[in-house]
């Protein structure tokens, strides 16, 4: 029976064990009526009022669901929050080695392998099926009414705040979640369920913010996107964030920000690479995050040689595909402009210019001029 605290705790312990066996690094439980969601909505609305979301208009919608996650899935009584480590190789501690390879394309580490959204949802569905089987075997009275739905950065959910309430870490000044024994190189996912599983109060109480006076992530950010708010908290101005500029932004990258992007063509890891807590970063336990098509070492000119079909073929099942071929080439053009002088770069930029959109051509012209300025 699921009507006693001991039995509920036993089921939670079983779920945690299954989650770990599937490859999740951690697992916690949150009630959908947790007051943190209303508090986060206030912060979101302030952020929106300042225009810091840029063109990400989806942040303006579904505020009722953000404040009350139960509206997303009927009969939700608990949310299982999980995290999944994605590092394949440990980076040098407290340094940004990406800056040492100006002719290479730098892609955020989470995006070099399979799209984590697909991986996460697949694992969460497997976890849900295991729970369903457990209920059928040991608690048949709950099996028929069991409702679940997996999410991974795919719905209006305050994902980091939810994970923080589940005891999976604290929100750092770079606004990413940090675990004291695992750093921040992990992705998050949620499984909404109809089971009345209580929050892990003890687990939550053992993890509090330990950023202290450290400002490493703030200082290392090339565009100074991390800002302290009047309330003493920190947020990220997406309009300045390299991840936003190279992934979410559809159109022209502001000219004044292009030199600061360097050779980052999809996302940016700088604020994580410099974080002292990532000396504890754990490596991935599944192969999905292994780099595909040498995306951990590929040169800018190699990527520039891709045509539209190459892009579709080599980004199949990858989060990179969502940025689209033309914007991807826009990003590579900017990086080529920032690379050391090379006549070969100038020649390749001009050869490909007629094949791309007017918007990308403008970035090619900028990149060409940057190269000429170094000659």
State where each predicted segment sits.
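C-terminal amphipathic alpha-helical segment
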Residues: 252-288, 313-317, 321, 327, ...
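Auxiliary alpha/beta "docking" domains used to position bulky ligands
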Residues: 1-209
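Iron-sulfur cluster-binding cysteine motifs and their immediate structural context
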Residues: 216-246, 264-288
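Alpha-helical adaptor scaffolds
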Residues: 293-326
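Short coil turns that connect the paired helices of HEAT/ARM alpha-solenoid repeats
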Residues: 321-323, 351-360
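Structural detector for internal amphipathic alpha-helices that build alpha-solenoid repeat scaffolds
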Residues: 329-340, 361-371
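Amphipathic alpha-helical scaffolding segments comprising HEAT/armadillo-like alpha-solenoid repeats
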Residues: 310-314, 341-353, 373-375
């Amino acid at each position: 029976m699921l009507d006693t605290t001991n039995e509920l705790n036993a089921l939670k312990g079983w779920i945690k064990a299954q989650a770990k066996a599937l490859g999740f690094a951690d697992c916690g439980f949150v009630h959908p009526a947790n007051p943190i969601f209303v508090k986060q909505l206030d912060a979101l609305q302030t952020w929106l009022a300042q225009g810091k979301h840029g063109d990400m208009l989806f942040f303006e919608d579904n505020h009722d669901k953000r404040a009350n996650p139960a509206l997303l899935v009927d009969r939700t009584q608990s949310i299982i929050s999980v995290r999944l480590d994605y590092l394949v190789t440990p980076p040098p501690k407290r340094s940004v080695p990406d800056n040492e390879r100006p002719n290479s394309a730098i892609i955020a580490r989470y995006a070099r392998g399979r799209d984590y959204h697909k991986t996460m949802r697949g694992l969460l569905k497997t976890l849900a099926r295991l729970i369903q089987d457990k209920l059928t075997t040991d608690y048949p009275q709950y099996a028929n009414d069991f409702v679940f739905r997996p999410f991974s950065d795919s719905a209006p959910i305050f994902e980091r705040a939810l994970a923080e309430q589940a005891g999976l870490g604290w929100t750092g000044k770079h606004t990413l979640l940090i675990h004291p024994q695992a750093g921040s190189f992990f992705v998050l996912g949620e499984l909404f369920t109809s089971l009345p599983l209580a929050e892990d109060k003890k687990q939550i109480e053992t993890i509090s913010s330990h950023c202290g006076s450290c400002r490493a992530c703030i200082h290392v950010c090339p565009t100074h996107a991390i800002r302290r708010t009047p309330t003493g908290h920190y947020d990220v101005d997406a309009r300045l964030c390299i991840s936003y500029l190279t992934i979410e932004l559809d159109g022209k990258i502001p000219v004044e920000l292009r030199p600061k992007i360097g050779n980052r063509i999809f996302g940016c890891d700088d604020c994580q690479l410099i974080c002292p807590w990532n000396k504890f970063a754990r490596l991935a336990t599944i192969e999905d995050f292994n780099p595909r098509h040498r995306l951990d070492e590929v040169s800018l000119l190699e990527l520039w040689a891709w045509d539209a079909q190459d892009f579709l073929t080599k980004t199949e099942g990858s989060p990179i595909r969502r940025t689209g071929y033309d914007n991807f080439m826009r990003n590579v053009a900017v990086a080529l402009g920032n690379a050391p002088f090379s006549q070969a770069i100038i020649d390749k930029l001009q050869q490909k210019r007629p094949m791309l959109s007017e918007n990308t051509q403008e970035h090619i012209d900028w990149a060409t001029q940057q190269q000429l300025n170094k000659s």
